[in-house]
Each structure stands twice: as structure tokens, then as C-alpha cells.
């Protein structure tokens, strides 16, 4: 199942029989191991692939909200496990539903303790290489489904950021980080009360961490190779490694000119 096949979530694919003949319910607001019994549910995966494919050309993607009525409708359809034509929803709605799913994960995708570890690594003046090592260790401790979700997310953030100069999306790594950090790092959210100085500091740290991961995407010391391979396979790209030991991703059409 690749980016080219997301339009109607129907009956599976040649490489993953678990999607055949049924649609898994997407559970909002439950722990990740309950939400992802096997791996990323089909509909959520298709939303990620839609944003990965169409998002780079869309202005303010990840920052501009989707239509709230459509966000509620799509969320309900996903929770009931009903068939859905993804093409009936805008890429902004897709991105908003993804952020909603992340924001409702109890403790966040990383967990409170891991968030604190990442904040400490970013706030103590630790050099960027050691910060990557901390992230790599935390990433490796997460369930495989969480790893798959994160590598698809950050790969998508990166392709959007890479297009910020050539398109009108205006979403460079810092702009994306500011827009998505609260969905990924729940301890930087101030729970509706008046924001304190420390809340703002944590939000800034969270944004800096997300921005750094986006900019480092492809680094061999950030995500394991098998996760980069997962990202390449599901987005329909070819994985290569360059002279700087960085993984790079190429669309099939660009292979003719490589």
C-alpha cells in the first residue's frame, strides 16, 4: 500500500493482507498499544500518505485547520471502522484529524518520562549529536507501531519543509514544529489555565526538538534503517544513502534522471 493508492480505503493490498476485507477502527483517546493492535490502522495510514503526497503544495499545511464539521465527520467514520473515500476530504482536514489523534493519546506519543528526558537533553546545552543519541534510544524503546507512526510523521514534515521555498506552503521546519509540537509533547500544554513562563519555555523546547528532528531526518543515527525503509516503502520512494551517510528518498519518476 503506497501513496498512490489512498483514495478509497477498501480491500487491502499485495503487501499487507491484514487490510483485506475489513477496516480497522481507529480508537481516539486510548493508549497507543490499544489504538494500534497490529500497526497503524488503515484509515489513519491513508491520511498520513495523503498529506505526504499532497501537503507540500498546500499553503500553511499543518498550521491551517481543516473544516471542523468535516474533521468531526471523518473522526467518527474512522472510529466506527466504516469505509471512507479519502479523496472527499481536504488535505487540511486529514492533517487536523492526525493532530487530533495525536493530541488525544494519553501521555502523548512519547510518554511523560520520555518527554522529560528529551526536554532535559535540549535545555542543558547538550550538543546536537548527543541529543540525537538520546532521541534514538527513546525511539527504540517505543512500540513498533509508534515507531512507524513517528517515522511517517517526520518524513512527511520533512517533505513539506523541503517544499517551503519552491511552493507557497510557507511551512519551513520551524513553522511546522510550532504547529505540531503540542500534539506530540503533551507536557508543554497548559491545560486551559493561564500560561505560565515555564509553560512557554516547555513549548519552546518542544518546538526546538521537533524542528531539530525534521532537519535531521535521514540521519543514520536518528532513526534505524528499517524505519527509513518502512517510510520509503509506504510512500513509494526509493531509499539511497549519500556520501555524507544520510538516507535520501527519491520518487520513482526522478530515478530516470538520477
Where in this protein do the model-derived segments appear?
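Amphipathic alpha-helical interaction surfaces
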Residues: 100-108, 159, 163, 186
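HEAT-repeat alpha-solenoid elements in large eukaryotic scaffold proteins
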Residues: 154-157
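Catalytic and GAP-homology cores of small GTPase regulators
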Residues: 2-129, 215-218, 225, 229
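Alpha-helical solenoid repeats of the armadillo/HEAT superfamily
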Residues: 148-152
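Alpha-helix boundary/capping and short turn/kink residues
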Residues: 107, 144-147
